[in-house]
Amino acid sequence: MSESLNYYVTAYYRFTKLADLPAIQKALEDKAEELNVKGLVILGDEGYNSTCAASSIESFEAWKTFIREYFNSPDQFFKDSESTKSPFRRFKVKVRNEIVTTGIPGVMPPEGVNHHLSPTEWNKVMKEETDYVMIDTRNWYEYKIGTFKGALNPNIEKFTEFPQYIEAQGIPKDKKMLIFCTGGIRCEKGILELQDKGYNNVFQLDGGILNYMKEYPNDQFEGECFVFDHRVAVDQNLQPTTKFGLCPHCGQPSTIKIECKRCDAHELICEDCIKVEYAKDTCSKNCAYQLEKHPARKGQKQLVPFEIEKMKAEGKDTGSIPQIRVTRTKYISLNKNGEAETRSTKETAE
C-alpha cells in the first residue's frame, strides 16, 4: 500500500451463528481501543457486518488477524482499500436482529458458494452474453450516483421492497438474472428470497461493487459507489469522492454548491432540498431554522464533526477550534484525544 495515504480501510462480513453478543461486543471494543481502530460493526445472532479503518498498516493488519482468530474464520474475505479521508470518527458496535436490513431475519445464507460470480466471470457475462437481465439491488440514491452499464433501477427506498419489485416486472423464472450490491452482503440474502420464489437462474457478484472496482476500475461500472461512512462515495480507484457530499438537510448524496445566507459557509445540497424554502439557502438544519426566524441576522459558521476530522487529516491545526453550537442545546468541541465530540452543554469535552 502507498505510504502517502493516511488510512487503511477494510469491509467484511460473515454469516455465522453467534452467542453471548455482549461479550463479543466488549472484546471488539477493547481490541479496537488497543489498536486505535475506528469503524462500525453490526453484530447479530446471524453474524457480523463491518467496515473499519486504521491510520497505521500495523494496526490495520493486526485487526484483520484478530477478526480471523476471534471468530475462527481463517478464510475471512476482506475488501481492502486506502483513503486520504478518515471514514469514521470513532469505533462503534451495534447489536441488531439482522446484520443487513432485508426484512427476512432468521434466513441464514449457506456456507460457500451460492451462484457467486467473480469480477472476472461477471465481466465475461457482460461482454460476451446478451440474454440476461441485470438488477441493482441498492436504494435509488445509490443507483443514481453510479451503477453497472445496462442495470435496471428498482427505484426502491429499502431492500425489503426488492422481492416485490422483481415479481412486479414479470421476469420469467428461468431468465438469467444478475444482481449486485455494494459489498455483496445484501445479495447473500436477496438471492435466497428470489430462489424461494422460483427464480433459479440468479447470480450474484462476489464481493459486490467494491471488489469489482478493485480488479476492474473504469470498466463496466459507471460513476461512483455510495458507501455508508464519511467518505460518502468512492471513485473508480476506491478513493473518497471529490464530487459528492451528504445533503445537510436530508442526508442524500448532493452536488449542488451553495453559500449559506446565514453564516456564509459553502455546502453541497441535493436536488430535492434545493427546491425547498430556507433549506436551499443554508448549510445546516440549524441555519435553516435561524434564517426562517431571523432573516436579517448573520450567525457563526457551523462546523460538524467530520469537517474537524477532515482538517486533522489535512494536517491543519485543530487546537484553536472553538465550541460550535449546532442546535439550541448541542455543541461540538474536541475531547482530550483530539476527536470531535457532541455535547449537550457548553463546556470543555473531556
Curated annotation (Swiss-Prot):
GO terms for biological process: tRNA modification. GO terms for molecular function: oxidoreductase activity, acting on paired donors, with incorporation or reduction of molecular oxygen. It comes from Bdellovibrio bacteriovorus (strain ATCC 15356 / DSM 50701 / NCIMB 9529 / HD100). This is tRNA uridine(34) hydroxylase. It comes from the Bacteria. The active site is at C181 (cysteine persulfide intermediate). PANTHER family: RHODANESE-LIKE DOMAIN-CONTAINING PROTEIN 7-RELATED, THIOSULFATE SULFURTRANSFERASE/RHODANESE-LIKE DOMAIN-CONTAINING PROTEIN 2. Its EC number is 1.14.-.-. It is an enzyme of class 1 (oxidoreductase). InterPro entries: Rhodanese-like_dom, Rhodanese-like_dom_sf, Rhodanese_C, TrhO, TRHO_N. Keywords: Oxidoreductase, tRNA processing. It catalyses: uridine(34) in tRNA + AH2 + O2 = 5-hydroxyuridine(34) in tRNA + A + H2O. Belongs to the TrhO family. CDD domains: RHOD_YceA. Residues 128-221 form the Rhodanese domain.
